[in-house]
């Protein structure tokens, strides 16, 4: 049952990984207005694409004045108001996946004229990050990066907070996980590691993100393939990949697990080796064989998205959702996805709101089955 639930959680990631890491291609032809999405080319200024925007709003054929599409006619939200500045909240230390995502989104927004400037506020875990976020009032300029790890991080810390209290903006991407070891490690394949975990699970120190997060669930699912329970593992939680890196390089943990983008530069520099990647196929961003290539039938990916304050007005929420819809269509964001080997898994508005409620419940269910939460 646990394996089935985990597989269901990862299904979207697997499908997207198969198609999501190739470079974007130029549009071959104009779409009719009833098939248009924001950013598509159009012909007549002022023409409407009825119901084709966020939450069933209209798109308008507009001559764009900012960003990569400046000077061209595009299906657009002419009423959208770009941000002045944004404070991103990251529930990880500097170098962690949430902060990395905030920086990537902020930089792409600036390139597209959707944002003038941004800052990132770091808190070391899910309760602290979400707690800080919820304590702020009347903030139109505040957004939080969430993801798979947050529901588990809240539950395993005994927090009463929930991501479903906030207003859902958009889900933006998924990222494959990487198992990494020091360059001098005795482990050459994932099966070498699994052999030691099976023989004596407590003897293998495994570093990853917070208890109950995607790293922990991925490790638990992998261990289950050799009959080891999640509660028997020697799992050491860190507040993001940034704080884990020195302990992997220094050999203070036998293996580390986090998103591929957090380890890629260190693998490329020869400071650590990627023992296995959780994508169905090898990735350009990091050198290493997949679990599937090594005979382990497991794929997984960590989604990340954006939440807005619970007291944000409906009008300001819709404007934020439209900004994210525009960003998703932009060359700057597509380049970011390719550069980081992130998977283009996008949901915005009410579709993300309904999805995240179900995802939150599914994650807690999986963690309960693994006996990581009660």
PLM feature segments, named:
Residues 1-29:
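Secretory targeting and sorting signals
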Residues 77-165, 228-254, 344-347, 369-374:
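N-terminal (or domain-start) structured segment
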Residues 82-83, 108-114, 136-141, 154-239, ...:
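Hinge/capping helix and adjacent helix->loop/strand transition within the periplasmic-binding protein
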Residues 83, 314-374:
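An extracytoplasmic/periplasmic, membrane-proximal ligand-sensing/linker region
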Residues 93-95, 148, 182-187, 209-214, ...:
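Short coil/turn segments
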């Amino acid at each position: 049952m646990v394996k089935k639930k985990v597989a269901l959680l990862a299904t979207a990631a697997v499908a997207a990984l198969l198609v999501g890491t190739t470079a974007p291609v130029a549009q071959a032809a104009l779409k009719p207005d009833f098939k248009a999405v924001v950013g598509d080319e159009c012909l007549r200024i002022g023409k409407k694409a009825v119901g084709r925007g966020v939450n069933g709003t209209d798109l308008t054929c507009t001559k764009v004045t900012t960003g990569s599409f400046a000077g061209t006619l595009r299906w657009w939200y002419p009423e959208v108001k770009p941000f002045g500045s944004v404070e991103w909240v990251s529930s990880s230390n500097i170098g962690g996946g949430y902060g990395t995502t905030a920086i990537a989104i902020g930089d792409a927004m600036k390139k597209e004229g959707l944002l003038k400037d941004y800052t990132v506020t770091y808190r070391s875990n899910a309760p602290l990050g979400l707690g800080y976020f919820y304590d702020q009032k009347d903030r139109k300029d505040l957004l939080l990066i969430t993801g798979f790890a947050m529901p588990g991080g809240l539950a395993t810390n005994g927090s009463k907070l929930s991501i479903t209290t906030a207003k859902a903006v958009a889900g933006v991407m998924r990222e494959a996980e990487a198992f990494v070891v020091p360059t001098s490690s005795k482990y050459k394949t994932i099966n070498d590691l699994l052999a030691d975990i099976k023989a004596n699970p407590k003897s293998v120190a495994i570093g990853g993100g917070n208890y109950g997060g995607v790293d922990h669930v991925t490790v638990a699912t992998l261990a289950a393939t050799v009959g080891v329970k999640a509660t028997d593992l020697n799992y050491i939680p860190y507040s993001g990949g940034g704080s884990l890196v020195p302990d992997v390089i220094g050999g203070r943990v036998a293996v580390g697990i986090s998103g591929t983008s957090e380890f890629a530069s260190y693998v490329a520099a020869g400071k650590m080796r990627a023992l296995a990647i959780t994508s169905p196929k090898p990735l350009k961003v990091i050198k290493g064989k997949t679990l599937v290539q090594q005979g382990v039938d497991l794929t997984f990916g960590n989604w990340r998205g954006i939440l807005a304050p619970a007291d944000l007005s409906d009008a300001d929420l819709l404007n934020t959702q439209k900004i994210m819809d525009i960003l998703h269509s932009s060359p700057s964001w597509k380049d970011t996805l390719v550069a980081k080997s992130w998977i283009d898994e996008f949901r915005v508005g009410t579709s993300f709101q309904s999805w995240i409620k179900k995802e939150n419940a599914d994650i807690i269910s999986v963690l309960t089955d693994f006996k990581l939460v009660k």
